[in-house]
Amino acid sequence: MALLGKRCDVPTNGCGPDRWNSAFTRKDEIITSLVSALDSMCSALSKLNAEVACVAVHDESAFVVGTEKGRMFLNARKELQSDFLRFCRGPPWKDPEAEHPKKVQRGEGGGRSLPRSSLEHGSDVYLLRKMVEEVFDVLYSEALGRASVVPLPYERLLREPGLLAVQGLPEGLAFRRPAEYDPKALMAILEHSHRIRFKLKRPLEDGGRDSKALVELNGVSLIPKGSRDCGLHGQAPKVPPQDLPPTATSSSMASFLYSTALPNHAIRELKQEAPSCPLAPSDLGLSRPMPEPKATGAQDFSDCCGQKPTGPGGPLIQNVHASKRILFSIVHDKSEKWDAFIKETEDINTLRECVQILFNSRYAEALGLDHMVPVPYRKIACDPEAVEIVGIPDKIPFKRPCTYGVPKLKRILEERHSIHFIIKRMFDERIFTGNKFTKDTTKLEPASPPEDTSAEVSRATVLDLAGNARSDKGSMSEDCGPGTSGELGGLRPIKIEPEDLDIIQVTVPDPSPTSEEMTDSMPGHLPSEDSGYGMEMLTDKGLSEDARPEERPVEDSHGDVIRPLRKQVELLFNTRYAKAIGISEPVKVPYSKFLMHPEELFVVGLPEGISLRRPNCFGIAKLRKILEASNSIQFVIKRPELLTEGVKEPIMDSQGTASSLGFSPPALPPERDSGDPLVDESLKRQGFQENYDARLSRIDIANTLREQVQDLFNKKYGEALGIKYPVQVPYKRIKSNPGSVIIEGLPPGIPFRKPCTFGSQNLERILAVADKIKFTVTRPFQGLIPKPDEDDANRLGEKVILREQVKELFNEKYGEALGLNRPVLVPYKLIRDSPDAVEVTGLPDDIPFRNPNTYDIHRLEKILKAREHVRMVIINQLQPFAEICNDAKVPAKDSSIPKRKRKRVSEGNSVSSSSSSSSSSSSNPDSVASANQISLVQWPMYMVDYAGLNVQLPGPLNY
């Protein structure tokens, strides 16, 4: 029986017989029994090829029964359930004054509850109600001609229907309390908010003196708004006449309304941080006088209001924009509803705006101001001792809100009431200007306690910090570009940040993990080399591209510090590597080889938490740590032959060494003419191939790192289950069952998820703490142990070993095809993109040639049985590996580098045999064409289905 049992809080309207009252104590059991019988009848009908879909509603519960297809139909169309439930309760959207006047009186405090069957998240309904309440308050204030927002007196207006006329409500809706509307009605009101008008038929006698203004037009108060009183009592503060033009008093609030959101892709392009200046009338949309909207009004709002909600079952916060007042209430009000809203919502834009409001408000409180001011993030990052941030959750660095993800934003908002800023001293201007000046004796010393300072110094500090925090309204948005400048000093003659919105700020000199995490916010998941080059390019080139002359000392000072450190570390690595291979002069370290073979090629003596990477990937703190431990750093090479696999760049210092590696360096004339086109073309071609191969090697490194992390997670998960071999981690089921599996030991700031979602830098950080990672299963759940296959139940651990053996076989055969007496790593991606370049014979008939990671255990066994017959023949030389051997054939002149496309393989997706490069596929042009159309990057462990975990293996395995 498929039982939803969603309880609804809507009071019944007498839809059921009186005998189903609560006086009948066993009515729930009888109803459940009858529904079960109904489900049995549906099962019997399904055996006769009949399909049934049934919705049963009783009191506060809804039941869905039927055949399998019928239940799928109803579950996919939950609006049918909610419509039927409302139909049983009576016609929707009726005027409560005519139908149920007593219920209106009774619900004035909290209102009637809404049927939850039409909405999954109660906190989203709460947000919609607050937004509709804001709309009504603004329209009522406009009708009064007030410059401030006045709460609408629902009790009096509903008691005297002739007092207020409401026009423009959606068809079928009557004016009542927002708490009495259902979610669809709330969304309809928000969609038509620009058409709604309030008109007072007769003036209120006490409305002028008893209305309470909640939000002034010159800014939002930092005091939490709290609960709102619907009655007409409370004194309204006087509004200065200069705060608002006379022409803007009556109709200027019309733009302070709500509408449904734009599509998700358009939302991402919008600015994602709230305005960090004091909320002026322009920020609330109240400063621009608007005429009475007619046809033009509907046209202006057509883009915002044309989108319908995706469905009543989804979280409606994805489909609405919350006003700044609502967001301010979320941040400052201590309400369980807002706490539930923060936990349930996944809208990153709303969360970022809330965190931005939180930081700006707390910073203003620290300055003693009564309005929000923008936080000078760059100044705090460069001079962290000036401002202390208290209460931020552990392992979350203080950064711009646009650099946080959803989990960190939620954690910050959960601790929002305990977060505070403490101003310790003024910012050291030498950090931002690079000038050396005599320190003013009136300024606060860093080491002196705050109580030793005079009131004048404190006042000067506040004015300086507040003045630096303010900026021109034209450039005040500070919205979501990670390097956006929000603290451009409006009163200062020198800009301290560039205007380019696309620059990522990575100039943090302290040893905090901010600079490393900023690289994760760069577009895409770059490998470690890309991250290093990207950071260097952005800091050294991008930041100074549009900078003024007086700004350049700031960037030069930071670059002057980090560049020599990088050169020293690079020289250190090259010297230690040359010593390990027996060469006296420094040799460039093949970082990719060390990352691809961590067991045979590694480095000892590095500081704790630092792995071998290019020096460009390190910040100042880690570079200094490496130099401090320079005497203990040593390169260990267990298998020297790995260094010669796939190497194209010979060591030009020694001809004998180059020859021993199987290369013949190009014989250039001693005096070459710079204008020789042949020489220039050969040099260009060589540089192009080097860049192309470097890109391929970085991709291979990233794939290798992901495979290693995946193997690590599978191994740790198997250990948590008490099994001695790896087990495929059920990521989706672990995510859907929070708390069932606890993962400990991950680096700070790295959440547990699929390795394919990490960049190379985070993958390296995970591998660096592999010994500390631990899985703990706290409670079982469905899918904890995958269902075993019939044939593979007893042989799951063997697949890893067989796969490595097939890899070694293919590498050996590929080396023989190149005319070398050693194994060579097979370029599976290049062969897949050019299936005619290499012909593989001797494989079993039903097995195409591809990456061994994609084979199942049966195919791996068949290949190993036929290993003596496997042969590889190179027909057309692969371009990036053209220099790997001396006897390779010269490629055709018109051959071009194949374009590669990367697609990730989803879980359980089988790789089609169209990527085969065997003789059968080379003779079939259709299969070759399909192979060129679909280019896949195989993630090896994601296609492994470890099952039968409680079955003993026949013997010990050396994993």
Swiss-Prot record:
Illness: GTF2IRD1 is located in the Williams-Beuren syndrome (WBS) critical region. WBS results from a hemizygous deletion of several genes on chromosome 7q11.23, thought to arise as a consequence of unequal crossing over between highly homologous low-copy repeat sequences flanking the deleted region. Haploinsufficiency of GTF2IRD1 may be the cause of certain cardiovascular and musculo-skeletal abnormalities observed in the disease.
Quaternary structure (record): Interacts with the retinoblastoma protein (RB1) via its C-terminus.
Annotated Low complexity bias: 910-923
Residues the record lists as Phosphoserine modifications: S448
Motif mapping: Nuclear localization signal: 898-905
Entry comment, domain topic: The N-terminal half may have an activating activity.
Listed Basic and acidic residues bias regions: 96-106
Family: Belongs to the TFII-I family.
Residues covered by region (Disordered): 96-117, 230-250, 468-492, 654-679, 892-927
Entry's Gene Ontology molecular function annotations: DNA-binding transcription factor activity; DNA-binding transcription factor activity, RNA polymerase II-specific; DNA-binding transcription repressor activity, RNA polymerase II-specific; RNA polymerase II cis-regulatory region sequence-specific DNA binding
Intracellular or extracellular location(s): Nucleus
Pfam name, any one: GTF2I
Function: May be a transcription regulator involved in cell-cycle progression and skeletal muscle differentiation. May repress GTF2I transcriptional functions, by preventing its nuclear residency, or by inhibiting its transcriptional activation. May contribute to slow-twitch fiber type specificity during myogenesis and in regenerating muscles. Binds troponin I slow-muscle fiber enhancer (USE B1). Binds specifically and with high affinity to the EFG sequences derived from the early enhancer of HOXC8.
PROSITE patterns assigned to the protein according to its UniProt record, in alphabetical order: GTF2I
Gene Ontology cellular-component annotations: cytosol; nucleoplasm; nucleus
UniProt xrefs under SUPFAM superfamilies: GTF2I-like repeat
Record location of the Glycyl lysine isopeptide (Lys-Gly) (interchain with G-Cter in SUMO2) cross-link: 27, 94, 184, 212, 225, 238, 271, 294, 308, 337, 436, 439, 443, 567, 579, 588, 622, 638, 684, 724, 732, 772, 774, 787, 829, 889, 893
Tissue: Highly expressed in adult skeletal muscle, heart, fibroblast, bone and fetal tissues. Expressed at lower levels in all other tissues tested.
GO BP field: negative regulation of transcription by RNA polymerase II; regulation of DNA-templated transcription; transcription by RNA polymerase II; transition between slow and fast fiber
Major location (coarse): nucleus
Ranges of the GTF2I-like repeats in the UniProt entry: 119-213, 342-436, 556-650, 696-790, 793-887
The entry's keywords: Developmental protein, DNA-binding, Isopeptide bond, Nucleus, Phosphoprotein, Repeat, Transcription, Transcription regulation, Ubl conjugation, Williams-Beuren syndrome
Name of this chain's protein: General transcription factor II-I repeat domain-containing protein 1
Protein's UniProt keywords contain Transcription: yes
